[in-house]
Curated annotation (Swiss-Prot):
Recorded GO MF terms: DNA binding; RNA polymerase binding
GO BP annotations listed: DNA-templated transcription elongation; regulation of DNA-templated transcription elongation
Organism the protein comes from: Clostridium botulinum (strain Hall / ATCC 3502 / NCTC 13319 / Type A)
NCBIfam families: greA (TIGR01462), PRK00226.1-2 (NF001261), PRK00226.1-4 (NF001263)
InterPro entries from the UniProt entry: GreA/GreB_C_sf, TF_GreA/GreB_CS, Tscrpt_elong_fac_GreA, Tscrpt_elong_fac_GreA/B, Tscrpt_elong_fac_GreA/B_C, Tscrpt_elong_fac_GreA/B_fam, Tscrpt_elong_fac_GreA/B_N, Tscrpt_elong_fac_GreA/B_N_sf
Protein name: Transcription elongation factor GreA
Coiled-coil zones: 12-76
Reported function: Necessary for efficient RNA polymerase transcription elongation past template-encoded arresting sites. The arresting sites in DNA have the property of trapping a certain fraction of elongating RNA polymerases that pass through, resulting in locked ternary complexes. Cleavage of the nascent transcript by cleavage factors such as GreA or GreB allows the resumption of elongation from the new 3'terminus. GreA releases sequences of 2 to 3 nucleotides.
Family: Belongs to the GreA/GreB family.
Superkingdom of the organism of origin: Bacteria
Gene3D superfamilies attached to this UniProt entry: Transcription elongation factor, GreA/GreB, C-terminal domain, Transcription elongation factor, GreA/GreB, N-terminal domain
Keyword terms of this UniProt record: Coiled coil, DNA-binding, Transcription, Transcription regulation
């Protein structure tokens, strides 16, 4: 049997997933149980859209709970004290110059479970994140992205 996938995460990321898991188990499950009770009170289940919707929501939430439990069970937490502060790793805040758009961008490197590109949290497994890992300020990298190659210069490396 193959080994379970390890999820590289920061302490902050683990805490966030634990909070989501707790919310789903305590609050959301109760809400859905109540919705199912109300829907059952309507009688005939064959055309009961409220019941179908509540059961679908229940399936989604239970699936997410299983996913979160698996991610937390297989979490590999990055000890930021073990990584030099000037080297890009998970937990680093990296300021880069994006040559394609001629702008400075700041990324936070996180594990794939924590990625949130809209908030500049990029995964260490993404093309750009992977290209930055192990590099230092002053390094220039070229990264293959879906629409070609992007070039970045690392301006600063800090810790979150």
């Amino acid at each position: 049997m193959s080994e379970a996938k390890k999820y590289v995460m920061t302490y902050e990321g683990v805490k966030k997933l634990e909070e989501e898991l707790e919310f789903l188990k305590t609050v959301k499950r109760k809400e859905i149980t109540e919705k199912i009770k109300v829907a059952l009170s309507f009688g005939d289940l064959s055309e009961n859209s409220e019941y179908d919707e509540a059961k679908n929501e229940q399936a989604f939430v239970e699936g997410r709970i299983i996913q979160l439990e698996n991610m937390l069970k297989n979490a590999s937490i990055v000890d930021e004290n073990e990584v030099p502060k000037d080297v890009v790793s998970v937990g680093s805040i990296v300021k880069v110059k994006d040559y394609e758009f001629d702008e400075e961008v700041e990324y936070i490197i996180v594990g794939s479970a924590e990625a949130d590109p809209m908030n500049n949290k990029i995964s260490n497994e993404s093309p750009v994140g992977h290209g930055l890992i192990g590099k230092k300020a002053g390094d220039i990298i070229e990264v293959a992205v879906p629409d070609g190659v992007s070039k970045y210069e690392i301006l600063e490396v800090n810790r979150a």
